[in-house]
Each structure stands twice: as C-alpha cells, then as structure tokens.
C-alpha cells in the first residue's frame, strides 16, 4: 500500500502489479487547489427540498436609527420567485419589490420611510406565500421590525416654513431632492417674512434647534391637519408633512405681547405689524404673578370654567369665563368684568374687558405665541 496525501494505492492486481484506487471520502479541489466542499455545502443548502427560510435581512431585525431613504433586502435559504407575492410594510410605504439575486429580494421605496416610525416587514408564508424555485414555501409568515431615525429639527423647520407656519421663509438653494430624500435636510436659507417683526419675537429663533417659534408653528400645523396639538414631531406629524397633501396655513401670522409695565397692556401683531395696541389688561397679583416668557396657546375656548384658590386662601369657581386662550398651565387670555384695568388683579391670568377679549379671541388660535414681560 502506498499513501500519497489523500490518494491511497491499495489494490494488488492479478498480474502482480498495483492498481490505483481513490478513497470515496477524498475531497475534490476547485481552481487553484481550493476545496469546493464549502461550495457544495452552500449549494446543498440552497437546493434542499426542505422548508424555505429567511436567513438574513437589511435592516436587521430590531435595528434602530435606520435612515429614511433606506431600502430593504431579504435573503432566503434557496432561490425564490415572487410570482406576484411580495412582503408587506406596516405602516405602508409606496415602492416596489424586485429580485436582486436568485436568493435575495429588495424593496425600492418611492417615498421616504417616515421618521420615528417602527416599521414592520411581513413576508407571507404557507401555500400562498413566497415560494422557492424548488417548490418549498415558508412554514409560516415571517415578520421583523426596525426603527426609522428621528426626524431632524432643521428639516422640520424647513417644511413648516414652506407651508407658511413660521414667520420665516425657507428658500432652497439646489434642485428638488429625490422623493426618497425629502425627509432629509436640504441646502438653503431662512429669511424673515416681514421686516417689522418685534425683537421680542425674532430673538427667540434658532435655526436647527427647538424653540418657542417652532413649537407654536408645529401646533398650528397639527391643528390644521387634525392631529393632537402636543408640539411633538412624532410619526403622524412627519407622515402629514411628507405626505401628498399637507395642509398649509392661509391665515395671518399673529403674535401677542403682554407688558406688565404699568399701565399693563397688550399688543397683537398681524404679519409683523401691530394690529391692536395698548389693550388694557390685568396680570397676576404679587402672590400669583403671571410668569414671564413666551408660550404657545394650547387651548382655545369660547367659555371656560375656572376653579381655584385665591392668594388669600378663598376659593373661586367661575363657570363661564368668556374667550379663553390658555397659554401657560392655568394662565389664559380671557375676558373678565373689572371696574378698571391696567394693573395686577388676577390669579395669574391676563384679564381684559369682555369686549376686547371677544375681539382678540379669533386671532389667538392654538399655536399663537404669547410673550409676557416686565
């Protein structure tokens, strides 16, 4: 017997010579002497007649921070054919599925993935599901989830400005982006829509960062698009902003400035210009001071029941306070009968005559900014 590597000479011929035999367990080699055992193993895996399985996906299951312009790839254990059967996405995203190799399919979106959304991909299984070319199907439907990255504050501001919710314009500096990139920041510049805007308002603006102007504009957008007015840019907000029919505002941009300098007064600006000035008001007394700051109106009621405790410990219950625009906790612009106005008398609200409150109320919807200073 002669052993040459994995080749064994073992047969004694009848003539007294040796015959060459090759062990059946000897591996074969591919080009360059490389073993093709791994290739055969992969081929066996893809050609097996057992159930079809999902072996990989991109994004991976439970991935987070996925870019809004990402595609989706699914890899199977064997060659597959779509034959009109495709995975589904929830929430739905428009696009098409196509084969990219014998064992892989890819989703090409024609719209961006909605920021902040958790997307679920479901691959149909069973007899009516996606089938391998060898006839096998997934035993059951297979699903995986991934989280889309949060939307960017700068892009939120750009979109709100283009829909006229901000007191600024946004002018893009390049061509329109591909539709799948519309959730991403675009190059361009902001500019104030009116040169007469008061510095109390313009000083609040910071590009790319959350601020009172952006929060008020977002609440106005939510109101007009029938969403919860919580000033949070969640999935429904981004879905509406990036959808086919976001509702722009056609009204004026209004802003309220309350001065606690005696005599206390209110000015309402429309599109940068003072529309109503020196409206006499009352703010909170010393033990219930109306807080300084800028706040968006979050509740807008023709009549409101107000219940609380006065600074002296007595309780009040006013069932029908007219023309209330709440802007900071329990503080609201509203009408209230007083003998006179122009100095602190309230429990924290900004009071004015009922006639003045009725005149201003239609101009202070949810999202209107109210600045209190002095």
Short names for language-model regions:
Residues 2-5, 9-11, 15-155, 168-174, ...:
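Acidic, low-complexity Ser/Thr/Gly/Pro-rich repeat segments typical of extracellular/periplasmic
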Residues 47-51, 141-161, 244-258, 289-292:
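Low-complexity, Pro/Ser/Thr- and charge-rich linker/hinge segments at domain boundaries
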Residues 67-71, 92, 100-104, 118, ...:
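Extracytoplasmic
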Residues 72, 119, 123-126, 152-159, ...:
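Stable alpha-helical elements in mature extracytoplasmic
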Residues 77, 81, 127-136, 158-166, ...:
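Sec-exported extracytoplasmic/periplasmic mature domains
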Residues 171-187, 201-215, 230-237, 256-259:
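A glycine-rich, coil/turn loop motif that links secondary-structure elements
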Residues 223-231, 235-292:
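Cell wall/extracellular polymer interaction/catalysis modules
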Residues 251, 289-292, 305-374:
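Exported/periplasmic cell-wall-interacting domains
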């Amino acid at each position: 017997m002669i052993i040459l590597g994995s080749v064994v000479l073992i047969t004694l011929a009848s003539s007294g010579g040796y015959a060459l035999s090759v062990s059946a367990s000897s591996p074969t080699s591919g080009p360059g002497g490389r073993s093709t055992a791994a290739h055969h193993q992969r081929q066996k895996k893809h050609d097996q007649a057992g159930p079809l399985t999902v072996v990989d996906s991109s994004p991976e299951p439970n991935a987070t921070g996925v870019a809004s312009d990402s595609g989706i790839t699914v890899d199977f254990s064997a060659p597959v054919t779509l034959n009109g059967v495709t995975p589904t996405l929830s929430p739905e995203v428009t696009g098409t599925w196509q084969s990219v190799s014998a064992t892989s399919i890819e989703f090409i979106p024609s719209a961006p993935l909605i920021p902040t959304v958790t997307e679920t991909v479901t691959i149909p299984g069973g007899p009516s599901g996606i089938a391998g070319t060898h006839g096998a199907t997934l035993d059951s439907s297979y699903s995986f989830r991934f989280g889309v990255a949060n939307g960017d504050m700068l892009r939120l501001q750009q979109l709100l400005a283009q829909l006229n919710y901000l007191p600024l314009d946004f002018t893009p500096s390049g061509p329109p982006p591909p539709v799948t990139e519309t959730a991403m920041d675009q190059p361009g510049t902001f500019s104030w829509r009116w040169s007469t805007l008061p510095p109390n308002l313009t000083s609040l603006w910071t590009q790319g960062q959350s601020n009172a102007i952006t929060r008020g504009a977002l609440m106005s957008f939510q109101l007009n698009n029938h969403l919860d007015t919580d000033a949070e840019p969640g999935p429904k907000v981004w879905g509406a902003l990036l959808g086919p029919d976001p509702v722009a505002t056609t009204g004026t941009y209004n802003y309220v400035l309350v001065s606690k300098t005696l005599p206390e007064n209110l000015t309402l600006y429309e599109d940068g210009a003072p529309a109503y000035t020196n409206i006499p008001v009352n703010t909170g007394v010393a033990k219930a001071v109306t807080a300084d700051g800028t706040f968006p109106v979050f509740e807008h009621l023709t009549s409101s029941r107000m219940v609380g405790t006065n600074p002296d410990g007595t309780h009040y219950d006013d069932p029908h306070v007219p023309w209330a625009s709440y802007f900071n906790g329990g503080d609201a612009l509203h009408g209230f009968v007083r003998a006179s106005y122009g100095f602190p008398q309230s429990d924290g609200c900004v009071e004015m005559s009922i006639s003045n409150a009725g005149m201003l109320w239609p101009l202070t919807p949810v999202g209107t900014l109210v600045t209190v200073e002095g």
